[in-house]
């Protein structure tokens, strides 16, 4: 093993050098730490580990007869609000006759102790291997030639050929040793992918819990990353992120209301249910590459089909009518509401709830004025006026349960 200094006399993971380096001392040192890195439970209250093979870590410096020892449970905690909180236990390996349980013989029963032995080991003998002084020696990386612990445990992967070049690299090396490895290790269990998925799911859950806490810097980054990867942050307008709305070309979706409200507009959430995923866009589109003076232009043509019997078919049609080439328009039900009068004001003739007396209408004069106004209208204006006058669809859209798919968004 190679010498080097590491901060603290603890069993915290540290970078490890080759197993084939200088042999560890034959007697105990001033420290009382395990020679090996720990295995860590994935959950709280996990039962003691079981091993596919002998459970003794690989170490070519140890004689076969001394390949026996015990795994000892170490409770762990992390600081939190209201005091420290428990985290899943760590288990450290010690050779028989060394470590915190040095007074026990192999096989003696004690809580938090699991005895292991390799084939051909003399379990009646006691090891002269001693324990590790963290100030002088690094941890061995764990390797199990005949099978490691069961799927309830994991350990941080440390490459065998990683060395230390002094104290200045200790922190970065330790951080790297604690990071998930993309490489496999001999004895690593096949369910490590499940562990990765579980950790990824926890990260997503944590992000969802903190989803409303988007900092100003994060929002700015969301709005100004590469154009094809942008998303609209809260309180941003559509044109702040994707530019002005247009007609008949790219950027033609969104009316004035949607442009102003951004993701607060419920129609955005509804339509995102029809937008293809990245994989669907790449593999389900007609992709057309074209070299231009400013670079490579990629065009993706994708069609989403909403069946006619879809419960929200009419709502999707309505949104498309409103938002495709919708710049300069607003939904018909997006009319300014009259301000409510304060109930604390005394009733007067001006604000009395009693209906005002209506004057008789002068039918002939009004009709004449209407006829003159109609003559000044274009055909498009007449059509718009007709929609405004006779538009009687409900102002509140009931999306129902089928507005979004069960697994969408």
Swiss-Prot record:
Keywords: ADP-ribosylation, Disulfide bond, Host Golgi apparatus, Phosphoprotein, Ribonucleoprotein, RNA-binding, Transcription, Transcription regulation, Viral nucleoprotein, Virion. Disulfide bonds join 281-308, 320-323. Residues 15-31, 162-179 have a biased composition (Low complexity). Pfam families: CoV_nucleocap. Residues 226-333 are annotated as: Dimerization. ADP-ribosylated. The ADP-ribosylation is retained in the virion during infection. Phosphorylated on serine and threonine residues. It comes from the Viruses. CDD domains: CoV_N-CTD, CoV_N-NTD. Transmembrane segments: none annotated. GO terms for molecular function: identical protein binding; RNA binding. Residues 31-156 form the CoV N NTD domain. The modification Phosphothreonine is found at residue 378. The keyword RNA-binding applies. Residues 29-160 are annotated as: RNA-binding. It is found in: Virion; Host endoplasmic reticulum-Golgi intermediate compartment; Host Golgi apparatus. The keyword Disulfide bond applies. Belongs to the gammacoronavirus nucleocapsid protein family. HAMAP family: GAMMA_CORONA_NCAP. This is Nucleoprotein.
């Amino acid at each position: 093993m190679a010498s080097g200094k590491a901060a603290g006399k603890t069993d915290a993971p540290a970078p490890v050098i080759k197993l084939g380096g200088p042999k560890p001392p034959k007697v105990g040192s001033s420290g009382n730490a395990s020679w090996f890195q720990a295995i860590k439970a994935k959950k709280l209250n996990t039962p003691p580990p079981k091993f596919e093979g002998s459970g003794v870590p690989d170490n070519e410096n140890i004689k076969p007869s001394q390949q026996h020892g015990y795994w000892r449970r170490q409770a762990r905690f992390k600081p939190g609000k209201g005091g420290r909180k428990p985290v899943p236990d760590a288990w450290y390996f010690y050779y028989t006759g060394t470590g915190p349980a040095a007074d026990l013989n192999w096989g003696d029963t004690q809580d938090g102790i699991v005895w292991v032995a390799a084939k051909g080991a003399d379990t009646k003998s006691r090891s002269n291997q001693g324990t590790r002084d963290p100030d002088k020696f690094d941890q061995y990386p764990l390797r199990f030639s005949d099978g490691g612990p069961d799927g309830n445990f994991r350990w941080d992967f440390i490459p065998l050929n990683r060395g230390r070049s002094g104290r200045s690299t200790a922190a970065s090396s330790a951080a790297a040793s604690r990071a998930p490895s993309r490489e496999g290790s001999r004895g690593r269990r096949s369910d490590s992918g499940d562990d990765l998925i579980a950790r990824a799911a926890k990260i997503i859950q944590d992000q969802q819990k903190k989803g409303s806490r988007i900092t100003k810097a994060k929002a700015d980054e969301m709005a100004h990353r590469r154009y094809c990867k942008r998303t609209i942050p809260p309180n941003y307008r559509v044109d702040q992120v994707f530019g002005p709305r247009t007609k008949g070309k790219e950027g033609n979706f969104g009316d004035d209301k949607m442009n102003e409200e951004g993701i607060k507009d419920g129609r955005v959430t509804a339509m995102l249910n029809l937008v293809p995923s990245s994989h669907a866009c790449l593999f389900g589109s007609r992709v057309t590459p074209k070299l231009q003076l400013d670079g490579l232009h990629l065009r993706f043509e994708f069609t989403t089909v909403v069946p006619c019997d879809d419960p929200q078919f009419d709502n999707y049609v309505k949104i498309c009518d409103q938002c495709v080439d919708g710049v300069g328009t607003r939904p018909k039900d997006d009319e300014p509401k009259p301000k409510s009068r304060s109930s604390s004001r005394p009733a007067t003739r001006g604000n009395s709830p009693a209906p005002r007396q209506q004057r008789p209408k002068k039918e002939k004069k009004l009709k004449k004025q209407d006829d003159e106004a109609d003559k000044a209208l274009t055909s498009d204006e007449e059509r718009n006026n007709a929609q405004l006058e006779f538009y009687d669809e409900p102002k509140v859209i009931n999306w129902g349960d089928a507005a979004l798919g069960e697994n969408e968004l």
